[in-house]
Amino acid sequence: MTKYIFVTGGVVSSIGKGIVAASLGRLLKNRGLKVTIQKFDPYINIDPGTMSPYQHGEVYVTDDGAETDLDLGHYERFIDINLNKYSNVTTGKIYSEVLRKERKGEYLGATVQVIPHITDALKEKIKRAASTTDSDVIITEVGGTVGDIESLPFLEALRQMKADVGSENVMYIHTTLLPYLKAAGEMKTKPTQHSVKELRGLGIQPNMLVIRTEEPVEQGIKNKLAQFCDVNSEAVIESRNVEHLYQIPLNLQAQSMDQIVCDHLKLNAPQADMTEWSAMVDKVMNLRKTTKIALVGKYVELPDAYLSVVEALKHSGYANDTAIDLKWVNANDVTVDNAADLLGDADGIIVPGGFGQRGTEGKIQAIRYARENDVPMLGICLGMQLTCVEFARHVLNMEGANSFELEPSTKYPIIDIMRDQIDIEDMGGTLRLGLYPCKLKPGSKAAMAYNNQEVVQRRHRHRYEFNNKFRPEFEAAGFVFSGVSPDNRLVEIVELKEKKFFVAAQYHPELQSRPNRPEELYTAFVTAAIKNSN
């Protein structure tokens, strides 16, 4: 029988529910249990694919092409699993599916209501996520805060699950903030008490509290919360601020969180062996070197827009015993005249993805600086496309060369729209999304990065591609197409072989990086940057 764990939040948003859920998932996985995890987002968008990065942060793409919340990146990195489209559910997605069924007459003339139709659809998503992965345990995080009007149908569905599958198969974990008033010198439990009261008013009694705090919590405070919130005192778990996120699973294990969960759900599983994880954390805490990487992007005011890129760089740093000192460079600020001033102290330059015209000329100048000064450079998605544009302009002398996306009237459309995208008008969910194969050119830097594999599978999110009619001119000038689709139709990786490391990929390698298993192309880039710093 599948076990269901529901993680809710109270008092404030962005309290770290996703990290708590991911950490618990890692502990349960290391007990030998098969775990999956999903995120419920109460916003009305179908998915975050068309949302501004300033609003939402990065869009995380799964193997099967779902555009999802960035928390799924945390889930995959912590638990080391590949999630699917059932792992992210929004209000918009649920309502659109219910309305589509109503239009088809599938409700046989019934009045369609929040209860039971919306709540039933939500419960079906929970069960489908568990069944498609054949999991022993599914953890479901509900975005937002208890008391938000948007989350009411989600919480009602969670309440009903207890009756549907039995109380011994369901556990409710509530995460809250425990504020510390410096002037009074004490922690205040009242916000948590009121949050739990709100949750209980919706019919959900939490079985565990996870309290986010900046200071150590005395047992007396835990006992008080246990008494007023009707949970066992040992089930009041402290989640204190840490230097590195990957410390959190170990901190939760030290408080027997996973054992309490297993006892409640009657899961007979051995103790979690966290030896490898602990060794990784110890290494992360004691890195001996530092390497400066300049990240040239258009959304640098919100680092979450590049969350997976940053994490992938860190992972590759761990493998090289080096901390990554990130220098955030706004692409809008980079010009041919100041590129050396902005980028001259960087050991490596990364140009990640993005959409739209703004910042593209600055990215092109950053790529040009890297090429002309032989600074290790990694381009991702749009960064790969602009790498091709830069080469066309400044090496092949194709004045005005550009991407068709950015300048439809360009004489040299180096990057063109994919053939199967021409007649598509909708923006959402219509890109080339998900896992696709990439055939590597033997002897190339890309092939060497991937240990001379013939083919690698990586996740994509794009609508435009390199225009193949320009391939002969590029190749004649020494531009190497080191990764292509198996049918040789789509360019996946480009590079300049004579440079220390000048490689750009159409796909998003960062989405498959793990703290204990860094993505190979990122590792090759960071390794080259380290050598460049010596």
Curated annotation (Swiss-Prot):
Binding-site list for ATP: S14, I15, G16, K17, G18, I19, D71, R240, N241, V242
UniProt xrefs under SUPFAM superfamilies: Class I glutamine amidotransferase-like, P-loop containing nucleoside triphosphate hydrolases
Record: residues binding UTP: S13, K188, T189, K190, P191, T192, Q193, K224
UniProt: CTP binding residues: S13, D148, I149, E150, K188, T189, K190, P191, T192, Q193, K224
Residues binding L-glutamine: Y54, G354, L382, G383, M384, Q385, E405, R463
BP-aspect Gene Ontology terms: 'de novo' CTP biosynthetic process; pyrimidine nucleobase biosynthetic process
Reactions mediated catalytically: UTP + L-glutamine + ATP + H2O = CTP + L-glutamate + ADP + phosphate + 2 H(+); L-glutamine + H2O = L-glutamate + NH4(+); UTP + NH4(+) + ATP = CTP + ADP + phosphate + 2 H(+)
Keyword Glycoprotein assigned: no
UniProt-listed Enzyme Commission number(s): 6.3.4.2
Pathway annotation from the record: Pyrimidine metabolism; CTP biosynthesis via de novo pathway; CTP from UDP: step 2/2
UniProt-recorded Gene Ontology molecular function terms: ATP binding; CTP synthase activity; glutaminase activity; identical protein binding; metal ion binding
Residues annotated to bind Mg(2+): D71, E141
Protein's UniProt keywords contain Disulfide bond: no
Residues the record marks as active site: C381 (nucleophile), H508, E510
Keywords: ATP-binding, Glutamine amidotransferase, Ligase, Magnesium, Metal-binding, Nucleotide-binding, Pyrimidine biosynthesis
Record GO cellular component, one term: cytosol
Domain Glutamine amidotransferase type-1: 292-534
InterPro entries reported for this sequence: Class_I_gatase-like (IPR029062), CTP_synthase (IPR004468), CTP_synthase_N (IPR017456), GATASE (IPR017926), GATase1_CTP_Synthase (IPR033828), P-loop_NTPase (IPR027417)
Activity control: Allosterically activated by GTP, when glutamine is the substrate; GTP has no effect on the reaction when ammonia is the substrate. The allosteric effector GTP functions by stabilizing the protein conformation that binds the tetrahedral intermediate(s) formed during glutamine hydrolysis. Inhibited by the product CTP, via allosteric rather than competitive inhibition.
Subunit comment: Homotetramer.
Function description: Catalyzes the ATP-dependent amination of UTP to CTP with either L-glutamine or ammonia as the source of nitrogen. Regulates intracellular CTP levels through interactions with the four ribonucleotide triphosphates.
Similarity comment text for this entry: Belongs to the CTP synthase family.
Additional record remark: CTPSs have evolved a hybrid strategy for distinguishing between UTP and CTP. The overlapping regions of the product feedback inhibitory and substrate sites recognize a common feature in both compounds, the triphosphate moiety. To differentiate isosteric substrate and product pyrimidine rings, an additional pocket far from the expected kinase/ligase catalytic site, specifically recognizes the cytosine and ribose portions of the product inhibitor.
NCBIfam families linked to this entry: PRK05380.1 (NF003792), PyrG (TIGR00337)
Name this polypeptide is given: CTP synthase
UniProt organism field: Streptococcus pyogenes serotype M28 (strain MGAS6180)
